Amino acid sequence: MNIIIVGCGKVGCTLVEALSIENHNIVVIDSRPEKVSALTDTVDVMGIVGNGVSHTTLKQAGIETADLLIAVTGSDEENLLCCVIAKKSGHCQTIARIRNPIYNEEKDFLQKEFGLSMIINPELTAANEISKVFQFPSAIRVDTFAKGRVELLHFKIGNNSPLCGLKLSKFHATLHCNDILVCTIARNSEEVIIPNGDFEFAANDIVSIVAKRKDAIDFFRKIGLEKNRVSNTIIAGGGKISYYLAKSLLMSGIKTTIIEINQQRCEFLSEQLPKATILCGDATDKELLSEECIEKAAGFAALTDLDEENILLSLYANGISSAKTVTKVNRINFTSVINKLDLGSIIYPRVITAEYIIKYVRSMNNSLNSNVEALYKLEDGKAEVLEFLLKENSAVCNIPLQDLKIRKNTLICCIYRNHQVIVPSGQDCMMAGDSVMIATSGYNISDIKEILED
């Protein structure tokens, strides 16, 4: 696929790195020569120094034959205009990054009137991910499928967990949890395992399971990870993510306090979020945190602009309270180190944004067999969990799973059919109209038939 990416900032770079691995022809555009050079020197892409709004620049980038243009500059207006000019200059689909809360309220209008294929708001997307883990604090990450009806829950095994040393073959009999399916195991931040019956759980493994919510709650109780729903939250930092998160939490009835050092920003937040408590102060001030009873907080989100501050704040919160903690990290260079720290749920906004866009790119390859409906990457892309909507002519339909020759390191995690969640056995079949969750490790797929051996 021919893809043009306008903007070589954090999100742009993450997109280029992820999409180039999937063998797309990519052209990047940015007005900053050093940003273009940094990408073209490390990734096999073509770079153009110029203004992405310019018709001449877009023509030079090959807009007439492009399949997709993604505008992720720092300016919402530039992104919108870039997409409009791209639509007029060629026949490509367009994606625009829009961050301003005012534009976000008019997203449907903008998408329709400007003919945009997709609008992505990184801060809102990150806030939604954080809100999900506050709703289910036993998990460190919650991914949703089938339009929110199926959940993939990730949790960390503690040193004293009953799972330690347990073989997967004895998992259901020991814990009496037949409706729980173990999908993937991330170990030492170095590998992601699609487990078989001989697999043995160990402390510090990150386990992902598919389950109905009530079954998951019962399972977490059995392994000692049961936590009550968060009732109050302290948010360090008053940026866009904090704004969207507070709005979501307040709508869910969760008391929310935001600590922000900038007076002008505090005034804005007070006007926009009248039900929240807004404090003007330094979130790293231990006395201020103590005054706000951080020791008794049910939830704590470190969302300042500095990774170092966020990491220290979450470590401090975990040390003095039992709060559900969430840590925002912008840089992704040291994920293997950061993931080993006791930071609760770690949110990488640019990675989340890239995942949403990659899902859309894969869905553009919709085939006779299936559509890609959702996609989540695990451990820096070492594994993926995808949702496919099966079509009538799919090569995998109406065949018992035990009779399908499924590739190594591939697992059919769940089938969603007629409002029912099916944890599949060998006798089950996939059928047209099903939403099917697939976990894979070691390769990328964009069509359900690719789970089969050649």
Feature locations, PLM:
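Cytosolic regulatory regions of ion transport systems
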Residues: 1-454
